[in-house]
Amino acid sequence: MSSQAFPAEEDHHNEERQTKKKRKTKHRHKFSEELLQELKEIFGENGYPDFTTRKTLANKFDCPVNVINNWFQNNRARLPPEERQRIFLTWKKHDFPVQACPFLSLQETQAAASNYATEQSFSCAKRALMRRPGCSLLEKQRIACQQMGYNCFSLENQETPSQQVGSMCSSLEKQGIPSQQVGSQCSYLVAGTEKHPGYALEYGGDTGSEHSTAYRFLSYNSAECLHPPPSSVPYFHGERTETRESQHASPFLLDYAQGAYGVKKDHCLCSFCLSLLQEQQQNDWQYHPQQHQQPQNYSEGMMLQEQLPMDSGPWDLEKQWPSAQSQLQSQLPQNNGKPLCSQLQHVPPQIAANSPLLPLGQDMQVGASSNSGLKCSSFRLRGLHGPATGTQGCSFAKYC
């Protein structure tokens, strides 16, 4: 009985061994002699192939990529340490071109590191200078040529062109006409008046009104880069539709800012009086539709304004102000030696009563013109809150 039990147990163990052998195992890939020879040649050239090379070899030999990886890894492991060090240095030089010897003393290593850092910082400065908008094409070519022939060991003896390039680039920002430099002091108040001289003042009434007019001032050669061009708004005059610019700042602020920005008061007075003269003459012409001819004072005032130089600065107008003032006084026969603001107070009441102009922020009562005198509120600036009754003086009497 026992003898029969042993063969049964042995058969059971044999079956277990056979089942273990039948399990799926990773078969070792065998290359042919030709493929092995080709792999050895590639391994001799580069023991650390990149992924593209390994993928190409896997497609060529019709095998997975991990088989190529294992073959190269096994061949590198079988090499002696000296050969493995040589192959590693070859691969390092191929990917990272290092021309220095790996065995250097401490002083040589510090000198090489300082020279490398200086060369890198100099090249970064070159690239930053070439990206500046003021550098011309010839300057960029000169910088590129100097960068190619640069020697890091003679950096201290060479004169770097960064100062020359920086001075040339900064000179572009400092260039300008002297009149533009003078006119730029008040360019923040009258924006864009070089091309659009007449939008500084407007009446307080509706822009759609037929009698809405704009004061005209002398042009300032202001810097265009400081302020954007004024936005255009539709302007209705009768049946025609024109386009005029919206006002950005009041010229009366010039008198307020004369101490901080050096603007002459006489220059402001000259431009303001010219605008008052022209506005009064335009009112006399517009309030009488039956007269289609321009008054003589209006044409004479325009001739006087054309005689003044349009591009003169505040200091030039200061010299010309006495002669211009005498001509202004002579152009008005009804002034009798009185200032312009006193003339505005003696405007006929029917003109102020029939005028449809309304000041901003105030309501005009019906019949107020019959009970009170002349109101200067219709002649005030937009946004300037001054007295509106006739008992008090005109709001711009202090500017005349």
Swiss-Prot record:
One of its GO terms (molecular function) is RNA polymerase II cis-regulatory region sequence-specific DNA binding. Residues 24-83 bind DNA. Residues 19-29 have a biased composition (Basic residues). Residues 9-18 have a biased composition (Basic and acidic residues). Its main location: nucleus. InterPro entries: Engrailed_Homeobox_TFs, HD, Homeodomain-like_sf. It is found in: Nucleus. Pfam families: Homeodomain. GO terms for biological process: regulation of transcription by RNA polymerase II. Residues 1-29 are annotated as: Disordered. Keywords: DNA-binding, Homeobox, Nucleus. SUPFAM superfamilies: Homeodomain-like. One of its GO terms (cellular component) is nucleus. This is Cytoplasmic polyadenylated homeobox-like protein 2. It comes from Homo sapiens (Human).
